[in-house]
Amino acid sequence: MSSVSEVNADIRDFLMSINLEQYLLHFREFGFYTVRDCTSINDSVLHQIGISPTGHRRRILKQLQMIFSKMQDFPIYANVHKAKNGSTTKEQQHSDPSSSTHTGIECSDSITVHRPGPAPSEMVTTSTLSEGNCQSPKSHDKLCLSSHDLLCPEEELHQNVDSSKDSLFGGVNVKIDPLITKRAVEYTAGEEHTEKGNLTSEDSSKALSTNTECLPSGDCPTSGTHSGNGTNGVLESFPPTPFFQFQGEMVVNELYVPSSPVHGPMRSRSKLVSRPSRSFLLRHRPVPEIPGSTKSIPGSYFRDRRSNTTSAGKSLTLKNSNEDNSTSIFPYGETFLFQRLESSKKRSIKNEFWPHENTVKEEAATTRNSILTQSSIYDNRKEKVSEDKVEDIWIPREDKNNLAQDSASESEYSTVEECFQSLRRKNSKASKSRTQKAFYLDPFNRHSYPLSSTSGNTEPSSTISNAISPYACFYGSSAAKEKCGWLDKLSPQGKRMFQKRWVKFDGLSISHYNNDREMYSKGIIPLTAISTVRAQGDNKFEIVTTQRTFVFRVEKEEERNDWISILLSALKSPSLASQLQAAVAPEKCGYLELRGYKAKIFTVLRGNSVWLCKNEQDFKSGLGITIIPMNVANVKQVDRAVKQSFEIITPYRSFSFTADSEREKQEWIEAVQQSIAETLSDYEVAEKIWFNESNRSCADCKAPDPDWASINLCVVICKKCAGQHRSLGPKDCKVRSLKMDASIWSNELIELFIVIGNKRANDFWAGNLQKDEELQVDSPVEKRKNFITQKYKEGKFRKTLLASLTKEELNKALCAAVVKPDVLETMALLFSGADVMCATGDPVHSTPYLLAKKAGQSLQMEFLYHNKFSDFPQYDAHFEGGSSQDAAQSSFLCDFLYQTAAAASRVSSEKKLLEDTNKKWCVLEGGFLSYYENDRCTTPNGTINISEVICLAVHKEDFYLNTGPIFVFEIYLPSERVFLFGAETSQIQRKWTETIAKRFVPFVAENLTEADYDLIGQLFYKDCHALDQWRKGWFAMDKSSLCFCLQTQEAQEERMNLRRLQELTISTMVQNGEKVDVLLLVEKGRTLYIHGHTKLDFTVWHTAIEKAAGTDGNALQDQQLCKNDVPIIVNSCIAFVTQYGLGCKYIYQKDGDPLHISELLESFKKDARSVKLRAGKHQLEDVTGVLKSFLSDIDDALLTKELYPYWVSALDTQDEKERTSKYRAFIRSLPGVNRATLAALIEHLYRVQKCSEINHMNAHNLAMVFSSCLFQTKGQTSEEVNVIEDLINNYVEIFEVKEDQVKQMDIENSFITKWKDTQVSQAGDLLIEVFVERKEPDCSIIIRISPVMEAEELTNDILAIKNIIPMKGDIWATFEVIENEELERPLHYTENVLEQVLQWSSLAEPGSAYLVVKRFLTVDSIKQCREKSIKEGILKLKEEPSKILSGNKFQDRCVVLRDGHLFIYKDPKSSKHDKMFPLRAMKFYLGVKKKMKPPTSWGLTVYSEKHHWHLCCDSLQAQMEWMASIFIAQHENDIWPPAGKERKRSITKNPKIGGLPLIPIQHERNATQARKNIETARAELERLRLSEKHDPRDFTDSSLKDRASLIAHCLEHKDEKLRNRARKHRSFNCLEDTEAEGPHGLPKAYKGPKTLKKTEERNSKATLDADPKLPSKVIEELSVVLQRSRPLHKELPDEQTLQKEVK
């Protein structure tokens, strides 16, 4: 675009070109419609019209300066003065040989102001005013000034003529013309025309003498014509000058030629506003051709002109209106006036495009001129002042009403413009509009004026307009009077007392602080809010506002008067009104909670500052607390419990705010961030880089006006893509802002972006990008991130021309390319895999960078410098066809993740660790996971070698932090370290875990990584194939399945359903001198032993397997299952009822205790494997109630609600076989677990109805009970009952049961009902010796201990045997005594006695341990201990094994018992404990071993798994108090059975017939009786074998339960003598309980000698001889079972072994 179009551009286009179109209304409101109107704009004017951000004002001023300075001509000022009534002035002509002309300036004073010394390049203004009277010239020399020909209103300068009487020339206008590039206008040197314009004055006839230093810069049309036709131009002569305009042709630098092959007649907006730096302009400035002749001006020329300023006339030389020269605006308005010869051919064009009757524009322009020129403070001095004296005066801003109607500089604005404006608008792109308002203005600027120009009187009839002289010098802001000091301020509330405050007045407001070091005030009073200031007595003064009166007090009266005078003078300042006018609406306001303040604070965001006010009324009155400037602030979201919190952080203080909602908080954060960005933004770099048209759209998504860039990839990108570019890592992508990172943008880097551009860069990066793969502007974040990673990191779309080159060839090509100017070739080589630091072969210039430096290629150097850390791999063109292993090698990920590392001891508090950490920038590349403090850091905080990972845990459930949900995964290393990472979405979590798993799981087990695993890693294992050797295998947890790939020849993936586990136990083995935990898993016929690398990863696996093997939900398939896929709860209930309920009347029609049913059902749901149903402990009715409740409460009915209409409709079929066939089809359609459960349940009900003669439960009665359970309906219907009855009656046909299975069922029923009265001993009973009160022979009792006996039962039995009745208030307990009677501890009443006894085997001297029953506590002591929730004291402590530093001595420690833990402190004043013992995990014994050499004999010993601690007390009372307190706290006050609780019995008379009873420990004399019992069992076996008609197949096929029952009966060893002896050792209460025990509905268990006699009679009827000895293997197996002390119901040996033993 030509420079004339630039100068005359519409203000809208100008603001759009610098992305500040939000200020369009501000400019138009004050009369700025074109760029030419802005010639006199400075920082103060911009501030007044409402542009508060400093960066925006600076950008506007720089752009205006650039436009005016781009003119190739020298600047010219035309100072045109217009008469009030439109009369003409006489022009004084000065002839010279060149016939050139210059204008005179009409002014009332002949005073010249000149600042000597500046260099020509500084363009210092030399102002010359000549006083004179304008004469009317001839008609052909006249050029009337028509008001409608002028663009701008008139501005008047009132000047004092002399001391006696002033002669005023109204309407003197001063206008600065923009500089216009000469090459934009074509003219002929020989055709030069000027016009004479005459100005007349009604008060004076003196003509303004010609200033020989001025040249014409504007046209003044005559009143007779608008176009200037018929007017002869006269050129004024001027002497040669070194500043004379050079008129040669300029050569355009190719750097600024657009890359587009087609160029329009004008430059685009990007070229218009691009402002290169000074060094860039110097290097690439246009080179003019040598002219034919030049003229110089002697140095004495200006001195001659200075002497001519006393001329009595004012002359004005008019130039052609079509000429494109104008004056340049420079900082502070300091310019010289120059002239150049212009052509007048196109003068008449100006009026064709300019509207002359635009009244609105004229009024607005009048406002503009009043802002630019008015001055309200003048000194009417009487004395004569020297001509060269200059006075600083304020420039007020409030007068907008005194307007002139015309401007003498009309020709400066009347150039061809409108046609160019329409073209430019088409190329303009609108930027996002932002509103930035100012609350307060900066201190006002000062200008210097000649005193004579300000001392004149203004005529009443003249329009008052105080114009700024073009000769004014800008010296910056005036030094406003400031004052600060310590004052006493009267508090507004409370006692109204004076408080010391540091008070500061900065010329705009009064603020008070707590001290002189604080940066933010406690209160602020702007001048605009002050009504008056008045003095009071006692050295006080008041500041009165509309809201309240502030009272201050000083020490001295002089100081008070000084404060008052300063404040009053500031109040009288004319600048105060301009502050009021500038107050505009805020961008955001509202009440927020501010930390440190009780009440909510009214917070206001206005422009570049945040105001804090007590309330909205204070804000409206102008009062505030403090102001937070945004240019030094930052805003961030706070991770606190209150989610609506955010902080504004400044270098001096952080302000923490809390909003009412999350939405409001986000709005505040966005508003503050936008204010900060706009305050700090500078478009200078962006405009330069946008000079290349391809850089005006994002390189990735084509978004317009991108303001970010990757400085090493050389692409310009938008804000959305910039966020994803950061994910590539700081080494591979350095993202910088074009607006805010100004320090990084050197001239060379800017030039590099202009030369390359997005188009050429994408020719390489996206050379193979298909149309359907392109990224759209509105693409989601995940797609954008994947695209950018594929494009730059993986090189998926780049050109592959260099793919065939090796690394060495690429390096050689790079060395050859860097010495040439083509940077694109270097970029292609480097990003194709060439090494930026490769060896060049030159010992001096050893790197490509040094080679480029040697060759002087600055752009190559710049590119290589920013890529010095880049490491782009050499991509294979056939990469996609490679193996998955290769794909894993190229995996790359990066993102912000929550990250923290934890030791093994702290992993339990992993979520708390994540709460205390911040996000880290995590990068996974090359098999290493590195985490950085942020995405700009180049040094990682830590690095994890993925190949060393042994376990990866993925938490599917989300965990909520203060910032929202996070999804955690853990990485375990062999060094007992665990790293926790948290992602914000499950997709990010899955992406990271999949990539990490593929890095450390080998190829042979890659199928494991494809599952939806919760845990994956490596474990050691043993199985049935090799039990003697531990091997490594890869395991993965997929919901309830354990997938594993073992080191076998097949190496196939296997799967184990953890819900079907028959056994899940943990044991310990010693390996390499250390204890290692081993997990045993048994599923059907498979056994697997596993252990981890460390205790930490084993704990993770064990916990996960236990959780997966447990119950997970209320659905049928989520229950723990047996090996036949029947839920354990169903199987256990069926087995219990089958064993004990076949002979019970109305078994399923009786209701149990609802409380017991609920407890038992909850136990099954918690862990069904651990629940063992035992007669005596569980009632039959409760078990049946559990079964019915479970079937009724599962999520879906066992027969499924979906099939309900089909089941009922089957009853319509009359044919029983056809109906049975339908039932069979329905059952096949059921889910597998439902089908197996239904089969087991119907089999059980079929068995029950088979015994209906005994239990009275036929098929119909059973169907009445179970129809509502199986269909889950309310109540019963006949159809449902009939369906269930059909299923029971037709069980054999529906489930296709074989005949031998039915026969076996009948045999089992007969055995169960036949042997129901037989008394069988409890399995695993032991006879042990228990002492009463002390260990003496007379105090011992030998008693039978069952595996389920608890300490309560043992204590009561011993007391009953000894006939001891405890005293009221005494508590007796069983004590365990060990270590040769040195240590003892009371057993809790619920502790299992046998378990404690079996643990004695691990003691050094097991034989010294025994049990004793004695008095423990009293009720009174318990009450005292319960009252003290916290117990503390000083005890002596010693640890075993002792630490090296602590020595082998007891040391005083402060011990505190609190919250179920025992805390050890070094001293009572310590705030951090040394040790902490959880009470439930410890055993506490009374006493201390003597070998520990305790200082006292009263102490406690604490046992843990690895360590022992010894505590010594001062007295026996203290010892007992500590023990009682610990015992009560350890069991949470539950230390004796509740009143009325029924005592449990462990000795049962009817144990399970199918169980395997054991021979109790007896004296040797009982062996003979045992052999007799075995012989009797053999005879019974033979009799049963004969009853099966000697069919060996039938006997072999009999069930395991049948033979187990048989052996159980054979091992009956209770003869009459032994029974009498056992009865002798039990109390009478026990005998009564024995008679009363047994399931409801069964006969009494004990029948006496008659039962034995009947049994002997049956045995005598055996037809076969019995072997007198039982096979030895049976005895061995029974011994093993006895040693293990297993519970009653255990599985028997396998079927073949049992058959062998029976035979």
Curated annotation (Swiss-Prot):
Residues 1653-1670, 1688-1703 have a biased composition (Basic and acidic residues). One of its GO terms (cellular component) is cytoplasm. Residues 480-572, 585-677, 899-1001, 1012-1110, 1428-1531 form the PH domain. InterPro entries: Arf-Rho-GAP_ANK-PH_domain, ARFGAP/RecO, ArfGAP_dom, ArfGAP_dom_sf, PH-like_dom_sf, PH_domain, RA_dom, Rho_GTPase_activation_prot. The keyword Cytoplasm applies. Gene3D superfamilies: Arf GTPase activating protein (1.10.220.150), Pleckstrin-homology domain (PH domain)/Phosphotyrosine-binding domain (PTB) (2.30.29.30), Rho GTPase activation protein (1.10.555.10), Transcription Factor, Ets-1 (1.10.150.50). GO terms for molecular function: GTPase activator activity; phosphatidylinositol-3,4,5-trisphosphate binding; zinc ion binding. Coiled coil: none annotated. The modification Phosphotyrosine is found at Y77. Keywords: Cytoplasm, GTPase activation, Metal-binding, Phosphoprotein, Repeat, Zinc, Zinc-finger. Residues 1114-1295 form the Rho-GAP domain. It is found in: Cytoplasm. Residues 222-232 have a biased composition (Low complexity). A zinc finger (C4-type) spans 698-721. GO terms for biological process: signal transduction. The record marks Q1149 as: Arginine finger. This is Arf-GAP with Rho-GAP domain, ANK repeat and PH domain-containing protein 2. It comes from Mus musculus (Mouse).
